[in-house]
Amino acid sequence: MQVWAIIYDKADFPDTLYQNALPFVDQAVQSKIKRFHRREDACRSLIGSLLPRVLLRKRGVSRDEMTFATTENGKPYCTTPDIDPPLGFNVTHDESVIAMAFGSGDLGPPAYNLGVDVMQLKVPPRITFSEFVDSVSSQESDQLTARERNIVLADIPEGEALRRFYWVWTLKEAYTKALGIGLGFDFRRIQYDVLEEKVTIDGELARGWQFRKFEVAHSGNKYVGVAARFVGGRNPSITDLDEGSLVCYDAASFVNRAIEELV
């Protein structure tokens, strides 16, 4: 499993580059991108759409041969024939980072059980960290288990508490994205004990699952992310992403290269 992380800064991404890259995705995707009111949101969506296309091009697939579809729950997947081994991918973004996790599609076709999430380490404005945690673990919106809440609200520096919270959150998101499940999944069914590096689903070990953690930094801001994939077997695996399996690009360079490769 690998992750490509694209670092987007709107000040370094000229409008001409956006316009030049737009024709390299199909008309339906272009229409979706153009519906965004803010140009930076459109650019993030465009980059997210280019990522799997560049990956397929590296596999020797021409742009005209690339085809995609979505599951009933809206998860995109590759329908290009004769990809061997089959390809699983998932794209996510938060603020300046657009990330794609990908790997061989072994189980859970057609979209395969692979998901990724990334989040910037920050507290929303005008609230404290404890208020932030309360907002996602109250009776009305209870998305942390008691164990997770105790871990993130322990007597530790806020920076470490914030990291713990977002490790928990991104793992839960990556897992549900790997399943291809939309909104509505009860996050309390998933528990990630960041101290013991243990993931349980409905109280049982998450057997057969790989979870790979990664970090990205940009302009003084830090991001954490998790890629999740079901590979089968008995024992779950939770480790940092292997060195060399995380590749970061700045957005302008990536999109310029995408244009060159997809011509």
UniProtKB/Swiss-Prot annotation:
Q: Which GO terms describe its molecular function?
A: holo-[acyl-carrier-protein] synthase activity; magnesium ion binding
Record has Transferase as a keyword: yes
One GO BP annotation is:
lysine biosynthetic process via aminoadipic acid
Q: Name the Pfam families for this protein.
A: AASDHPPT_N, ACPS
- Asked whether the keyword Transferase is assigned, the reply is yes
Q: Which UniProt keywords apply?
A: Transferase
Q: Which SUPFAM superfamilies match?
A: 4'-phosphopantetheinyl transferase (SSF56214)
Question: Recorded E.C. number(s)?
Answer: 2.7.8.7
The reactions it catalyses are:
apo-[ACP] + CoA = holo-[ACP] + adenosine 3',5'-bisphosphate + H(+)
**What InterPro entries does the record point to?**
4-PPantetheinyl_Trfase_dom (IPR008278), 4-PPantetheinyl_Trfase_dom_sf (IPR037143), AASDHPPT_N (IPR055066), P-Pant_transferase_sf (IPR050559)
Record-stated family = Belongs to the P-Pant transferase superfamily.
Function, as annotated: Transfers the 4'-phosphopantetheine moiety from coenzyme A to a Ser of an acyl-carrier-protein. Activates the peptidyl carrier protein (PCP) domains of surfactin synthas.
Protein name according to UniProt: 4'-phosphopantetheinyl transferase pptA
Q: What species is given as this protein's source?
A: Paxillus involutus
This protein's gene is called pptA
